[in-house]
Amino acid sequence: MKRLFYILMSVAAIFSSCSDDDSFSTSRNDLLSFGCDTLSLDTLFSTIPTRTYGFWAYNRSSDGIRVSQVRLEHGNQTGFRVNVDGIYLDNTTGSQAQDIEVRKGDSIRVFVELTSPINGNDVPQLVEDNLSFRLESGVEQKVNLRAWSWDAILYDSLIVDKNTTLSSVKPIVVRRGIRVDSTATLKIISPATIYFGGSAGIDVYGRLTIEGAPGSDVVMRGDRLDNMFDYLPYDRVSGQWRGIHLFGSSSYNTFKYLDLHSATDA
């Protein structure tokens, strides 16, 4: 046991000496290199969290670089959430962190999410902030964070147990599905674009009437607004939502000028 203890102490001393030998630059010429100058998130619905995005910050200089402070310039005002090298920029501490070391030839990972507040507009609005890195040398470097936020009418689930009409210039987002009871009619009139979550669809036991118009289809699609690949939006990938299911008790359904896509069934 003693021998093992001394071996472990020797290994610790080696790592300690390596750490002590690392020098950190205060030269204004030594900078971080970022994987992007602007991190563009996809269009999102207000109050609904985005997926997690990320980028790398590299130290390609011959010395270590200390980041004395990293912060969101607008604090908690825009809804961005950031984690830098495992440190969450907590809103209670001013959305900032201090004293992050990036050793020579090393890198750190930055993760970004956004839940934007309601903006009060019918069209998408730009949401942006700057993630500022202040180096020990006094140099300040920034990465712009931006997204387009879209106010929507949100339903977790919608049970139609009486005659109901849906129509809105705003997007309609349904997280868990729509059920039309056997004694009810759901009428959807253009303008109407309905975005369904992955487990959502329309189960019709009563009657479903869709009334689009020439040049103004009623649109039903999945709620993913981002891309599977750079060249392929999720909107063009099947299986993004459950589609429409007509049950035995359903009758007299009419579909006029309906654009239904990216579903599993229809």
Where do the PLM segments sit?
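Short, composition-biased linear "edge" segments at structural boundaries
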Residues: 3, 63-64, 252
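Short, solvent-exposed loop/linker segments at beta-strand-coil boundaries, enriched for Pro/Gly
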Residues: 71-96
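Sec-dependent signal peptide recognition
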Residues: 2-9
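Short acidic/proline- and small/hydrophobic-mixed sequence motifs that coincide with surface turns
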Residues: 50-52, 62-67
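Asparagine-centered strand-capping/turn motif at beta-strand->loop junctions
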Residues: 57-61
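Beta-strand/loop edge motif enriched in small/polar residues
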Residues: 22-25, 32-43, 48-50, 54-56, ...
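C-terminal motif of bacterial Sec signal peptides marking the signal peptidase cleavage site
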Residues: 14-17
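Extracytoplasmic/periplasmic/luminal assembly and interaction segments
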Residues: 69-70, 190
